């Protein structure tokens, strides 16, 4: 494994551990010790997707899990994963899961709740 691949793996691990807080590419680059441009280029090269897309998709997967496994309000889940409004969250969630959060919850909510 190259040094660059190790750096990206370390960054992915750090991102996954910090998805509960706002993550800006500038901050991630600073944390990694790279320029924003260089980090984004490396990430795309090794992961095959942009850094921003990776973060957004990970947050959406966690939000989907919360919709499925908890009774938290959609608005609270939206805020928990750093979306600036419920409207934005609903639009992005619908684009990813082909249904709005409320419908996703009704269809997938755990039997335990």
From Swiss-Prot:
HTH araC/xylS-type domain span: 9-107
Induction remarks: Part of a putative romA-ramA operon.
Disruption phenotype: Deletion in clinical multidrug-resistant isolate KP22 increases sensitivity to many antibiotics, including tigecycline, doxycycline, minocycline, piperacillin-tazobactam, ceftazidime and levofloxacin.
InterPro entries, sorted: Homeodomain-like_sf, HTH_AraC, HTH_AraC-typ_CS, MarA-like, Tscrpt_reg_AraC-type_HTH
Residue ranges of the annotated DNA-binding region, renumbered to this chain: 26-47, 74-97
Effect of residue 31 to D: Transcriptional activation activity declines significantly on either acrA or micF gene promoters
The keyword Transcription appears for this protein: yes
Keyword set, alphabetical order: DNA-binding, Transcription, Transcription regulation
Matches recorded under Pfam families: HTH_18
GO MF annotation terms: DNA-binding transcription factor activity; sequence-specific DNA binding
Subunit structure: Monomer. Interacts with the C-terminus of RNAP subunit RpoA when part of class I or class II promoter complexes. Also interacts with sigma-70/RpoD in class II promoter complexes.
Record's miscellaneous remark: Overexpression of ramA in various clinical isolates confers multidrug resistance.
Function: Transcriptional regulator. Binds to regulatory regions of target genes, including its own gene, efflux pump operon acrAB, antisense RNA gene micF, and various genes involved in lipid A biosynthesis, including lpxO and lpxL-2. Regulates expression of many genes, perhaps including its own; activates various lipid A biosynthetic genes, and as a result of activating acrAB, confers multidrug resistance. Plays a role in virulence and survival in host cells.
NCBIfam families, per database record: ramA_TF
Designated name of the protein: Transcriptional regulator RamA
